[in-house]
């Protein structure tokens, strides 16, 4: 899963974040929305052909058009370095023809809101950079 990226450095996750953005944009353009799109539900591997992703917990999916805004909102639950999320969202926004600065600002705001609310009800067992 993507859990191992929680403490990684930018040079370790930069290409992974961009590849994940391509994967997310691709499934969204194919009208697939995983409602629990989080690091624990995304399996990945890298080989000579690049990065490969697979989703688990697939009983929580919607099928139908995924707007750019809905797709961006779907990226709010990533933890770990903010830079990972910034790279992911910037690349996703480019692929969906959105303004990258506005997309990053929107997702970071929603990310902070999500984790603040989550932290009121649950213990967060890792360092969270908001």
Feature roles, as predicted:
Residues 41-55:
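Conserved protein kinase catalytic/activation segment
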Residues 51-127:
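C-lobe/activation-segment region of protein kinase-like
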Residues 1-15:
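Conserved structural core of kinase catalytic domains
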Residues 6, 36, 46, 62-64:
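Activation segment
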Residues 23-32:
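Protein kinase catalytic-loop region centered on the HRD/HxD motif
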Residues 32-39:
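Catalytic-loop of the protein kinase fold
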């Amino acid at each position: 899963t993507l859990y191992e990226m929680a403490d990684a450095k930018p040079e370790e996750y930069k290409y992974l974040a961009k590849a994940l953005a391509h994967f997310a944009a691709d499934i969204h353009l194919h009208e697939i929305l995983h409602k629990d799109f989080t690091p624990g539900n995304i399996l990945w591997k890298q080989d000579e052909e690049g990065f490969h992703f697979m989703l688990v917990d697939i009983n929580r999916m919607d099928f139908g058009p995924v707007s750019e805004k809905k797709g961006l909102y779907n990226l709010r639950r990533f933890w770990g370095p903010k830079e990972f999320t910034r790279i992911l969202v910037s690349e996703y926004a480019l692929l969906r023809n959105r303004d990258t600065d506005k997309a990053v600002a929107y997702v970071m705001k929603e990310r902070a809101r999500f984790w603040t609310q989550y932290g009121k009800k649950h213990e967060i067992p890792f360092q969270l950079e908001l």
